[in-house]
């Protein structure tokens, strides 16, 4: 017999009474008492709940009585490309989670104690019928705002693609979503970016590109001969335009100074997947789906090279021959900076001023940043740093800065 449990944040008596009605002879269990909530890109503020509201519901759960599991007690960080997403009925329907999973939990992203933690400790002790020896609390980690460092090298978009190994390149007559690509020993691509490239398309001065019978999952950037033709993403209203999941059969004007044979690149970023919902929710193939046609001036473009950009640690660490930094950025670019460390401490990158992308420290993927917020920092735990030289690589899609700035506090957004 399965033990049914409850998930909620408010109205504990109503929820637990309903649970007891379904299984009167079973113990009450709250499998997820939501201590806060996660944040999504484009939201105006960092989600929080008050200590008073949190404490009130927690005490009422234990008083009912029922057992409880906090979601979250410590949220931590969505390192790499592993952030999840939510869905909703209203626009924009799909909501990608930010990299920080601070969640306004009793322990912060860095493991620091909060007033919620102390309230939780007090309430649990009050209702604990068994005398328990409580160990000493671990010492809070020291945080350091290292001095800003200059960006010293870059690789342009074509240089990046030239460094992708043959086993991550696929020839296909039509476009294919990343999960079906014959990469990773035939297991497909799960995360990152996928590039659809055609080296010889005939472009007119005012050519039009159309995604027929499909859309982008989740964001598409179009380039002609390495020059970006799609706008920088800054607002949710743009999600209704060409380049995103909201609008099928969207069109883009490829305004060009001249006509001729060009290299067409369509770079698609997987923003993260949803892990719950109805059956239809779980069709979460990323990139450009099968049966999608790419039309240039109403003619289908066929014969693609599909390149998997997975940013695995070994590949990031292998990058070399960095060129000088250019002040004019026309396409997604990799940037290099070097941090000298005497003693590693926890720190944060302050990514305000950058556009959208991901950061790697000594090959480790810290996760995504995005100027849309609400979060503008990336957490670097001390164990990811080493005494001496640390290499920081930034993959920026839109707008770069000349420096990387550190802070000793997270920038999670207005509360």
Say what each PLM segment does.
Residues 31-36, 60-66, 73-303, 311-323, ...:
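Carbohydrate-binding surfaces of carbohydrate-active enzymes
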Residues 48-55, 63, 192, 214, ...:
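Short, glycine/acidic-rich beta->alpha junctions
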Residues 190-201, 329-342, 378:
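Short beta-strands within extracellular/lumenal beta-sheet-rich domains
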Residues 1-70:
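Substrate-binding/catalytic cleft of secreted carbohydrate-active enzymes
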Residues 123, 248-263, 335-342, 377-389:
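Short, surface-exposed tryptophan/glycine-enriched loops
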Residues 15-20, 39-44, 80-84, 223, ...:
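Short, solvent-exposed loop/turn and secondary-structure capping segments
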Residues 378-415:
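Terminal leader/tail segments of proteins
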Residues 207-225, 264, 339-362, 369-370, ...:
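Aromatic-lined ligand-binding clefts that engage carbohydrates, nucleic acids, or primary amines
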């Amino acid at each position: 017999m399965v033990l049914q449990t409850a998930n909620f944040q408010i109205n504990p008596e109503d929820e637990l009474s309903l649970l007891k009605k379904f299984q009167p002879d079973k113990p009450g269990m709250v499998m997820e008492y939501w201590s806060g909530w996660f944040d999504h890109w484009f939201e105006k503020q960092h989600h929080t709940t008050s200590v008073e509201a949190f404490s009130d519901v927690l005490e009422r759960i234990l008083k009912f009585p029922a057992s409880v599991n906090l979601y979250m007690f410590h949220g931590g960080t969505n390192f790499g490309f592993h952030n999840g997403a939510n869905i909703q009925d209203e626009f924009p329907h799909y909501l990608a989670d930010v990299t920080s999973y601070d969640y306004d939990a009793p322990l912060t992203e860095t493991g620091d104690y909060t007033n919620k933690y102390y309230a939780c400790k007090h309430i649990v002790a009050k209702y604990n019928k068994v005398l328990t020896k409580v160990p000493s609390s671990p010492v809070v980690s020291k945080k350091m705002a290292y001095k800003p460092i200059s960006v010293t090298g870059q690789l342009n978009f074509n240089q990046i693609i030239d460094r992708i190994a043959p086993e991550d390149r696929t020839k296909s007559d039509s476009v294919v979503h990343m999960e079906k690509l014959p990469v990773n020993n035939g297991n497909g691509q799960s995360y990152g970016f996928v590039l659809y490239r055609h080296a010889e398309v005939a472009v007119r001065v005012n050519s039009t590109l159309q995604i027929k019978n499909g859309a982008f999952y989740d964001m598409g950037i179009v380039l002609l001969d390495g020059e970006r033709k799609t706008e920088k993403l800054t607002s949710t209203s743009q999600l209704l335009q060409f380049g995103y999941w909201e609008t099928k059969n969207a069109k883009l004007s490829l305004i060009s100074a001249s006509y001729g044979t060009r290299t067409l690149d369509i770079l698609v970023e997987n923003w993260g997947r949803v892990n719950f919902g109805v059956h239809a929710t779980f069709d979460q193939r990323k990139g450009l789906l099968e049966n999608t046609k790419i039309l240039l001036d109403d003619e289908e473009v066929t014969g693609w090279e599909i390149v998997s950009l997975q940013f695995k640690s070994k590949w990031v660490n292998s990058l070399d021959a960095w060129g000088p930094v250019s002040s004019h950025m026309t396409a997604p670019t990799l940037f290099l900076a070097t941090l000298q460390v005497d003693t590693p401490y926890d720190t944060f990158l302050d990514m305000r001023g950058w556009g959208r992308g991901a950061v790697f420290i000594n090959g480790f993927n810290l996760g995504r940043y995005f100027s849309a917020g609400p979060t503008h920092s990336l957490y670097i735990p001390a164990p990811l740093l080493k005494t001496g030289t640390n290499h920081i690589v930034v993959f920026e899609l839109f707008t770069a800065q000349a420096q990387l700035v550190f802070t000793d506090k997270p920038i999670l957004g207005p509360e």
